Structures are given as C-alpha cells and as structure tokens.
Amino acid sequence: MNEQQFIEALKKKGIELSEKQITQFKKYFELLVEWNEKMNLTAITDLEGVYLKHFFDSISASFYFDFSKVITVCDVGAGAGFPSIPIKICFPHLHVTIVDSLNKRITFLNHLSDELQLENMNFVHARAEEFGQNIKYREQYDVVTARAVARLSVLSELCVPLAKQGGYFVALKAAAGAEELKDAKKALTTLGVKLKEEYSFKLPVEESDRILYIFDKIKGTPKKYPRKPGVPNKTPIQ
C-alpha cells in the first residue's frame, strides 16, 4: 500500500486526510526507519509495509469505534506508537497516554511527538502492571487500547484496570482472537468488562484476518488487579 493508496483507502472509510496529516504520516515513516537502524522498533521497514501493516492497520480500529466521541486514550505497550499515534494523527483532539516498559522506545516516541507537533501526548516508562496500580492513571481513561501485545487473557489484566467505569477496552487481534476470547472469559468478567461488539475484517492488499473487540467497562476492577509484573503472563486469570 503506497501513500496514495493509503489516502484513498482512508477516504473510502470517511477519513479525509489534510496536507498536514499526510505530511505527518510521511515524517512518521521516515523517523521510524531512521531510528530503527539504532534500535529495534519494527521488523517492517519498507514503505508499503509500514503504510499497510502499521498505519492502516492501526487506524482500522476507528472504522468500528468512534474516536470522535471520546477524549482520553491509553495505549498499553505501544512500541513504536501503534495503534495510538496513527489514530491520534487522524483524530487530533485526543489526549493520548502511551505506557511502555522500554525506555529507549519512550525516547523515540518523545522525539516523534515533537517532530510531528502532536499535542496532548504523555509517554510513561513503566511496566503495565505497576502503571495500572498507580492511582494517577488507574480507571482514568475513556478508552484503553492495545495491538498484539499479549493474548487476551493477559492483555485484559494489563488494560482493563486503566479504563474508567463507562469507558471501553478496545483490542485489535489477528485471526487467533476468537480462541483467545474463549480463554479470556473469566478474566474479562473478573476485571469488570463485557463484550459490546466484535468485528471481523480483512486487511486490504494482503487479505489477512483481523478481529476488533470492543468491551464496555461496567464495574470497577478489583484492587488486586493488575497483579505484580510478570504474574499475569505466567498465570492468567482462569
């Protein structure tokens, strides 16, 4: 997917990019490739791959969830900024917090944000488990999202505690998502969310399967979650 195809594909979905936004994506691609030479940010570095598998794939969440109706977004383990920064470029009003456990990625994100002139961005170097127990961040966000960070039973424990009651947990998954959802039923109920909507679709060009899950936060998360760093991954809620 080249830049023009990317612009056209978004237009078909009702997102018309301004010149400023087109330039922001171009700059994002350049910085990603440049910084990737000194640190491992992504295995995908060709233009067509980045525009499809990082930019378009990230924004695809907004085809099914209306980001224009929310303000605060937290992205857990965003790595090089996916999915939240492409979403932020398309929806500039958003206040975005990204938490990542690797400080060098936070350094990249700070630089990226400055270069793209993004406002209302907050980057936090922390383990998601500790971040979710911090009262400054816990149950503070309209939307908590993550893309391919961990299986859903683990991911939900890292993300759901950050969503406010009445907020949402939005998870972008590949084809294995359906199996993961079954395994995560207990975790999702325990943490206080219920499945609102589920969308299956294909990423254009390569036709790979994607599933987007939107969960409603219907009650507060019990204080014991998230548990200590590493525990959710070793022993998911069952």
Curated annotation (Swiss-Prot):
Keywords: Cytoplasm, Methyltransferase, rRNA processing, S-adenosyl-L-methionine, Transferase. GO terms for molecular function: rRNA (guanine-N7-)-methyltransferase activity. S-adenosyl-L-methionine binds at G77, F82, A128, E129, R147. Its main location: cytoplasm. CDD domains: AdoMet_MTases. HAMAP family: 16SrRNA_methyltr_G. Belongs to the methyltransferase superfamily. RNA methyltransferase RsmG family. This is Ribosomal RNA small subunit methyltransferase G. The gene is rsmG.
